[in-house]
Amino acid sequence: MDARELIDKYHMNTYSRFPVTLVPGEGARVWDDEGNEYIDLVAGIAVNVLGHCHPAVVEAVKEQVERLIHCSNLYYNEPQAEAARLLAEAAPKDLNKVFFCNSGTESVECAIKLARKFTGCTKFIAFEGGFHGRTMGALSATWKPEFREPFEPLVPEFEHVPYGDVNAVEKAIDDDTAAVIVEPVQGEAGVRIPPEGFLRELRELCDEHGLLLIVDEVQSGMGRTGQFFAFEHEDVLPDIVCLAKGLGGGVPVGATIAREEVAEAFEPGDHGSTFGGNPLACAAVCAAVSTVLEENLPEAAERKGKLAMRILSEAEDVVEEVRGRGLMMGVEVGDDERAKDVAREMLDRGALVNVTSGDVIRLVPPLVIGEDELEKALAELADALRASG
């Protein structure tokens, strides 16, 4: 039996997969078990910001795996110390306390607990279209009914309002509201960018009412949108930030970053993770964060994003909308089946893309993708869109 047959037989039926088994990868390219080569515009769903098997991450993991893989948080470990320092220094001033976990949804769970503990309140305001994870707390903040309804009742007191509508947020605030949780760019909803000034207005509103502002940077962080954090486009300081995906350069890891005043609400025993902050994952964090900063990959993402939008504009007449920020882009085609057909067609054309929100082709390539690779893959996508239109 091959990998596909084994997974179909033994793995729970939780994923809709393309009929491709990926084996090796390097940079922005991957190969399947039949030797076919693909330019990767999915990057493990925005995880591989440094591409596949980046030498800095590979070397850091190799070195650490021979030294100390895991020791729990009963003890201090050096990679965790260095990773926390790097993140605190990469974040804007006052965001200087870090909690490490293993995934994006865990980082959101931490943020929810911390906001409750700090404020003493239990209500959260989230947004229509928002996606924050699939564990029970993060799922409560998530909007999509298909994700939520099979598992209700969820955590109570999460109210969803239209994305980008500050007036709706203000109307939803009551005396028991702890925080507003928001994505600076909604990824799962089809790469939706809020109106300019939205985050600033949210910050002002939270300050006015004594609420915390939680910004979910799980998909948009690590330089993807042209800044290390997407909220930096509006020069806003959140109280809590959720980070994962690209944080480990492909190694599973998440982090919750908070202002010191807020973080001090936690005491030993309030929250924890057996694997969170383990030496192996944190060695990868050190390599990934250092590389993103030293190679100025946010600037590269902004530059390549502009190139991508120019190429995709050639297909604007056969789609509903092309939108994006940096290397986080969405092509809304207006028809669910057409979007799926184009994604499958792209396999034959030698590129990986994925579909989100039904009819949006999401493009989140590695930040290190070569401009020639980007041009080649997007030219094929533009051609496939025209052919399907």
From Swiss-Prot:
Binding site for N(2)-acetyl-L-ornithine: R134, S273
Other facts: May also have succinyldiaminopimelate aminotransferase activity, thus carrying out the corresponding step in lysine biosynthesis.
Cofactor remark: Binds 1 pyridoxal phosphate per subunit.
Chain ranges passing through the membrane: none
Catalytic activity: N(2)-acetyl-L-ornithine + 2-oxoglutarate = N-acetyl-L-glutamate 5-semialdehyde + L-glutamate
EC number of this enzyme: 2.6.1.11
Protein family (similarity comment): Belongs to the class-III pyridoxal-phosphate-dependent aminotransferase family. ArgD subfamily.
Modified residues (N6-(pyridoxal phosphate)lysine): K245
NCBIfam families assigned to the protein according to its UniProt record, in alphabetical order: argD, PRK01278.1, PRK03244.1
SUPFAM superfamilies hit by this protein: PLP-dependent transferases (SSF53383)
Pathway the protein acts in: Amino-acid biosynthesis; L-arginine biosynthesis; N(2)-acetyl-L-ornithine from L-glutamate: step 4/4
GO molecular function: identical protein binding; N2-acetyl-L-ornithine:2-oxoglutarate 5-aminotransferase activity; pyridoxal phosphate binding
GO cellular component: cytoplasm
Binding positions (pyridoxal 5'-phosphate): G104, T105, F131, D216, E217, V218, Q219, T274
Keywords (A to Z) from UniProt: Amino-acid biosynthesis, Aminotransferase, Arginine biosynthesis, Cytoplasm, Pyridoxal phosphate, Transferase
Protein name as it appears in the record: Acetylornithine aminotransferase
GO biological processes: L-arginine biosynthetic process
UniProt subcellular location: Cytoplasm
Main EC class the enzyme belongs to: transferase
Cofactors demanded by this protein: pyridoxal 5'-phosphate
Subunit note: Homodimer.
UniProt xrefs under InterPro entries: AcOrn/SuccOrn_fam, Aminotrans_3, Aminotrans_3_PPA_site, Class-III_PLP-dep_AT, PyrdxlP-dep_Trfase, PyrdxlP-dep_Trfase_major, PyrdxlP-dep_Trfase_small
Main localization of the protein described in the UniProt heading: cytoplasm
